[in-house]
From Swiss-Prot:
Record's keyword annotation contains GTP-binding: no
Lineage, opening ranks: Eukaryota, Metazoa, Chordata, Craniata, Vertebrata
Pfam families with a match to the protein in the record: Homeodomain (PF00046), SIX1_SD (PF16878)
Record gene name: SIX6
InterPro entries from the UniProt entry: HD (IPR001356), Homeodomain-like_sf (IPR009057), SIX1_SD (IPR031701)
Keywords from the UniProt entry: Developmental protein, DNA-binding, Homeobox, Nucleus
SUPFAM superfamilies, alphabetized: Homeodomain-like
Keyword Nucleus set for record: yes
Localization of this protein: Nucleus
Gene Ontology CC: nucleus
GO molecular function, one term: RNA polymerase II cis-regulatory region sequence-specific DNA binding
Organ and tissue specificity: In the developing embryo, expressed in the anterior head-fold, the anterior neural plate and optic vesicle. At later stages expression is maintained in the eye, while brain expression becomes limited. Not expressed in the lens placode.
Record family assignment: Belongs to the SIX/Sine oculis homeobox family.
Name of this protein: Homeobox protein SIX6
Positions of the UniProt region annotated as Disordered: 195-246
Length: 246
């Protein structure tokens, strides 16, 4: 029978390799390395207690679409707070992707809220504090800086920015997509506001010419008032510049 080569690595050495490959973002090599690890009961027991190895297995499970394995790892092993942020992102993103596949469409903020309510974070990767699902100010600042340089980052830049912010490449991509949508909506809102104001000015000038004198001034007031209300309505068409639920 063919025998797999036995790697004489200590659990600490295995953990070090996992951490290095995780930081490099080379998920394919990380997966191959995990597959090559020994399956002897004694070795498995030691590795199954190592957080770096467990985190690496969770990351590989996520990137290969093996969400059942991901959930099993996260629900059955207690992780330290240093790993919570990344593992929480994997948990939520996996459930989001499953929901999108089931519904056949991208999820909106309300959809994501419902998914989070249905699949709350397990206490193994959560300390019980409520999470706002908004990015920290430092993260938003970095994202905005990169957005001003390039609103359409390629996959390599997304991975680089993900490492700089502690987010996943998918989260980075979603933020850029949502930001582009908000900018387009804001531009459309401004155009509509200018059109409404221009129409209101035209109506009031026409009313003044037709009525003349004080009567004309009185007649123009409803038109000006109407244009102001329309402009106000136009301003509220788009939502606020929210950066939550990404």
């Amino acid at each position: 029978m063919f025998q797999l080569p036995i790697l004489n690595f200590s659990p600490q050495q295995v953990a070090g390799v996992c951490e290095t490959l995780e930081e490099s973002g080379d998920i394919e090599r990380l997966g191959r390395f995990l597959w090559s690890l020994p399956v002897a009961p004694a070795a498995c027991e030691a590795l199954n207690k190592n957080e770096s190895v467990l985190r690496a297995r969770a990351i590989v499970a996520f990137h290969t679409g093996n969400y059942r394995e991901l959930y099993h790892i996260l629900e059955n092993h207690k992780f330290t707070k240093e790993s919570h942020g990344k593992l929480q992102a994997l948990w939520l993103e996996a459930h989001y992707q499953e929901a999108e596949k089931l519904r056949g469409r991208p999820l909106g903020p309300v959809d994501k809220y419902r998914v989070r309510k249905k699949f709350p974070l397990p206490r193994t990767i959560w300390d019980g504090e409520q999470k706002t699902h908004c990015f920290k100010e430092r993260t938003r600042h970095l994202l905005r800086e990169w957005y001003l340089q390039d609103p359409y980052p390629n996959p390599s830049k997304k991975r680089e920015l993900a490492q700089a912010t502690g987010l996943t490449p998918t989260q980075v991509g979603n933020w850029f997509k949502n930001r582009r949508q908000r900018d387009r909506a804001a531009a459309a809102k401004n155009r509509l506001q200018q059109q409404v104001l221009a129409q209101g000015s035209g109506r009031s000038l026409q009313a003044e010419e037709e009525s003349g004198g004080e009567a004309g001034g009185a007649a123009s007031s409803p038109a000006v008032s109407l244009s102001s209300k329309a402009a106000t309505s136009a301003i509220s068409i788009t939502s606020s510049d929210s950066e939550c639920d990404i």
